């Protein structure tokens, strides 16, 4: 049976760290991100699933009279993120060797617009939370992915353990992506080991 390797975008294919955004939010609000973190996290899935836009998100998190730039998420993403071209080339080599590759990523509608989709044309599967109206780590997204892929042999690489833990419940193999493990060659080795 064909093996399928799915990759997250932000924090994996795209160099990204959530702390960059939290620092920008702290700077604009002139108060620690920790003060709004629970409300922020409680509403993030609605943003990822296109149930609300960035403006509505901030009105819910901070109230209607907030002072934050309501495009802070997409602006920070555009300003700070970059493509990991070395990893992207490695991923494309997996496809050249007969494997199927895909993307499973949480994106806001606004950050989705920041991504050069032509860079991702070679991917066989595209699962974007804002398009399919489901987000990680909610179980329904993994159920949906498994039903869309005609293989029971799926590997998922993500930078958040909670997303991987949920994937494991659907018999998806997982690898936690960290920059150190990538720089040392461990991520590519684990993927190669999975394929052999």
Question: How does the language model describe each region?
Answer:
Residues 1-7, 153, 196:
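Non-catalytic pre-domain segments flanking phosphatase-related domains
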Residues 15, 103-105, 176:
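Hydrophobic residues in well-ordered beta-strands that form the structural core
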Residues 6, 104, 156-157:
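Generic enzyme active-site microenvironment
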Residues 88-96, 146, 168:
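Surface-exposed amphipathic alpha-helices with a cationic face
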Residues 2-89, 97, 108:
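N-terminal helical cap/lid subdomain that shapes the substrate entry/recognition surface
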Residues 1, 96-99, 148-152:
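Glycine-rich phosphate-binding loop signature in dinucleotide/nucleotide-binding domains
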Residues 108, 113-196:
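Asp-based, Mg2+/Mn2+-dependent phosphohydrolase catalytic module
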Residues 8-11, 50, 103, 126, ...:
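Generic structural signal for small/hydrophobic residues in well-ordered secondary structure
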